[in-house]
Regions:
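Long, positively charged leader/targeting segments at protein N-termini
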Residues: 162-218, 223-226, 257-632, 638-647
């Protein structure tokens, strides 16, 4: 699992129990918070006493004007606290940049300089500004505790970055976020390996607590990209001529602004290796997916990117300076990282530094939204998170197809499966010459249906309806009359273009399900390995350090594909068995028993199709039995009358 990527939709905002300051204004405390802050101020007083040099002497010859100034000047707040008191409180709250400014002001007016130096020193450490922290250490040259704090922070940074060359980019990234008044006091970036990182909790986090706030000025939104010369040019044709207009716009921004000092701190931290994304697979890695329909998705995605790239080269000056490979990487950054948000009721997409470092996990630990009042992107905990625990986002409920194609990883226990089943309408189907006239063009002769392990009602109904059309052997016009008779409840376009054919009879439905089972079995036969062989391979290798990451992803994808096909084969077998029931009570009894044991997901098909067909069949047989009985009775009566006449 690789880091970074957002939820596909905006999360529902909840009321926060944690109050944080406006990110563009000084932190104003309530009277309750002021009272609570006394303990924090006391702790800082003790810390300063314990860490101060015993030989340090106070300057006794301060000017009277300075002395008066320090007692009269407050922090432009209504809480009647001095600069140093506000600095301490803001430090405790995690607003290090604001705390630093107040500490520096306190030093400037020579008020509580020892405390102010100590607070400033700690602020620089928290903001990873080691050089400035060392300067403040010089003011306390004999202070061993401060030296130890500094060395520990340096060591923490080096250990956390895992390799020295990552250190400058990592530090610069955090420094810039702090300078822009970003808020994440309880979070730290952790590197598990050279290429895999996550976000950990430095302190205990409570449910509903705001754990991150990234100001709007740090976000790269569609509006930011549109405000450039090339962005304005792209906007003239993006929706008409590009396959992925928004992604292309933001990708262009990444390419053109690569060396822009405003964003360089963020761009420098973006990954350079994209070999885990399928569009960059080697021939050997493509062979892992032999006969998988996923190969077609990769080709189509790359083709769409190529078309967009060609169009941008044609329309945008100097775009040819960027290679197609570089454009693809920029597109992958966007597709795997953007957040869909709403700012002042305007929907937009945005890159959000730091927030995009959260890895994926379901169920979610956090929710995110843009807060118009705070003018910032907010991440909020939806459960308690312990110290040292990794903090996750949820990228949404997606299949491994979507995860691998757009994010470069798969999930081992993903209950969402997908298989694109392609059906080629040809002369092997009955009444081919008559039926082909109903297709708009030759492309309609080949249709693909996404089989889903969640068994979505609309998808399976569309597939089975289409098969009813293909397998129908009587006068096709009668079938369309049946469709058109339902137009009161059925959109005409859906009826004609999507072949929404209602169940005809049990015999026809048996044909349809038998054919669907046959199609799924044929797809399974294409693979060089069985699902049992794939599962065995994965189980034997998943804990090995040298288990190739891309091979792992391909194995999990193949297992997922085959699982879906097997699931639909089992569905067909089960429903065929039900359709052979003679009485509706037999169906109800069996389904009630099996539902408790299996809790299968295709209840709606049983209810809407099978029960109705079996009921109609049973009713028809009862009517036939009644007619036969009446016929026999009449025959008997006629015979009796004939005998009476003979007598």
């Amino acid at each position: 699992m690789l880091p970074i990527v957002p939820l596909p939709q905006k999360q529902k905002r909840k009321n926060s129990k944690t109050n944080i300051a406006s990110l563009n204004q000084p932190f104003i405390l309530s009277q309750t918070e002021i009272d609570k802050s006394k303990s924090s101020i006391f702790k800082i007083n003790i810390a300063v006493k314990n860490t101060s040099n015993n030989n340090t002497n106070k300057i006794n010859n301060k000017k009277v004007s300075k002395k008066n100034e320090k007692t009269e000047i407050k922090n432009n707040n209504n809480n009647n606290l001095t600069f140093i008191e506000n600095a301490i409180i803001n430090f405790e709250k995690g607003f290090y940049n604001q705390s630093l400014q107040q500490a520096l002001k306190s030093i400037e007016i020579e008020d509580s300089e020892e405390k102010a130096n100590y607070i400033a020193f700690l602020c620089y450490l928290e903001m990873y500004d080691i050089d400035s922290a060392e300067k403040f250490l010089c003011n306390n040259n004999n202070n061993k505790k401060l030296k130890n704090l500094l060395e520990n922070k340096k060591l923490q940074i080096l250990l956390n970055s895992n390799k020295y060359k990552s250190y400058p980019k990592y530090i610069n990234f955090l420094q810039n976020l702090h300078k822009n008044n970003s808020y994440f006091p309880k979070l730290e970036i952790h590197f598990y390996t050279d290429d895999y990182r996550g976000v950990l909790a430095k302190n205990k986090i409570l449910k509903d607590e705001i754990i991150m706030a990234i100001p709007k000025q740090c976000l790269i939104t569609l509006e930011v990209a549109l405000n450039t010369n090339y962005g304005k040019k792209i906007s003239e044709f993006m929706h008409q001529e590009l396959n992925s207009p928004k992604h292309c716009l933001l990708s262009s921004f990444l390419l053109f602004e690569e060396n822009n000092p405003i964003y360089k701190y963020y761009f420098d931290l973006l990954p350079n290796d994209y070999s885990n994304f399928p569009i960059f697979y080697t021939k050997k890695e493509f062979d892992y997916l032999k006969n998988s329909p996923f190969l077609n998705l990769i080709m189509n995605k790359k083709l769409d990117m190529q078309m967009d790239y060609n169009k941008l080269c044609e329309k945008i000056e100097n775009f040819k300076n960027f290679t197609f490979e570089k454009f693809c990487k920029a597109r992958l950054i966007i597709s795997s990282r953007i957040f869909g948000i709403s700012i002042n009721n305007n929907k937009t997409d945005a890159l959000v530094p730091f927030a995009d470092l959260l890895n994926h996990r379901r169920p979610r630990q956090t929710q995110w939204f843009f807060d118009d009042d705070k003018n910032a992107f907010i991440v909020q905990a939806v459960e308690d998170i312990n110290i040292g625990q990794e903090i996750f986002d949820s990228y949404g409920k997606k299949t491994n197809y979507r995860f691998l194609l757009n994010y470069g990883f798969t999930l081992e226990n993903n209950d969402m499966g997908e298989y694109p089943l392609t059906i080629n309408f040809n002369n092997e189907y009955p009444l081919y010459n008559m039926k082909k006239n109903f297709f708009k063009n030759k492309y309609d002769f080949i249709r693909t249906f996404n089989l889903n392990s969640n068994f979505q009602e609309s998808q399976i109904l569309e597939l089975i309806s289409y098969l009813r059309f293909l397998l129908y052997e009587e006068n096709i016009n009668n079938l369309f009359k049946k469709i058109l008779s339902n137009r009161k409840t059925l959109n005409e376009e859906i009826a004609i273009n999507y072949y929404f054919f209602y169940p005809i009879n049990i015999e026809m439905e048996i044909k349809v399900l038998s054919h669907l089972k046959y199609l799924c079995e044929k797809e399974l036969e294409k693979y060089p390995t069985t699902i049992l062989q794939d599962q065995k391979l994965y189980k034997e290798n998943k804990n090995k350090k040298d288990f190739n990451f891309n091979y792992r992803n391909c194995l999990l994808l193949l297992i997922s594909e085959k699982s879906v096909l097997i699931y639909y084969i089992q569905f067909c077998d089960y429903c065929l068995q039900l359709l052979k029931s003679k009485k509706i009570t037999e169906v109800i009894d069996k389904v009630a028993k099996d539902y408790k044991e299996n809790n299968f997901k295709y209840n709606f098909y049983i209810k809407e199709v099978i029960l109705k067909l079996v009921y109609e069949k049973e009713k028809e047989e009862i009517e036939n039995d009644k007619k036969n009985y009446e016929k026999k009775q009449k025959t008997k009566e006629d015979k009796d009358m004939d005998e009476e006449d003979d007598i």
